[in-house]
């Protein structure tokens, strides 16, 4: 891991690395395409585990995009965290990299992670649309209980 990425990861609550498992084209118009993206990956940081995601993404003619997603995270201790969110993407660069950002909310039944109930999160990261891989850095604004 490069110094830049390791210091970047240390600044954030979570780092999520995922791979696309399935894409479905939902709708095509003369100025956009809507696809469903299913991916799964690993979580490191505040807690460790895995994540499953279903994301509806609409890409416009100019390459910009908007997305909304549903995410299920399972920690290495078996705790489940559910999150929803939405955001935007810039047009891909010449290497197929899309810079994305977004925000959302999360919930869990875990007593240990109860401060995540109703917590807001923001994210930023990159998706490689050629490889179907994503790295996302998440910042969680935890609730006080």
Task: Mark where each language-model region is.
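Beta-strand-enriched cores of mature, soluble protein domains
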Residues: 2-145
């Amino acid at each position: 891991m490069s110094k830049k990425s390791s210091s970047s990861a240390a600044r954030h609550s979570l780092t999520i690395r995922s791979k696309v498992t399935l894409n479905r084209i939902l709708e095509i118009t003369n100025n956009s395409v809507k696809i469903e993206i299913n991916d799964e990956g690993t979580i490191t940081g505040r807690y460790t585990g895995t994540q499953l995601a279903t994301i509806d993404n609409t890409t416009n003619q100019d390459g910009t995009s908007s997305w909304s997603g549903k995410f299920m995270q399972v920690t290495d201790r078996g705790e489940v965290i559910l999150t929803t969110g939405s955001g935007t993407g810039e047009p891909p660069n010449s290497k197929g990299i899309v810079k994305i950002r977004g925000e959302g909310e999360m919930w869990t039944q875990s007593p240990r992670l109860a401060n995540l109930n109703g917590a807001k999160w923001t994210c930023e990261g990159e998706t490689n649309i050629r490889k179907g891989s994503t790295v996302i850095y998440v910042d969680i604004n935890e609730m006080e209980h």
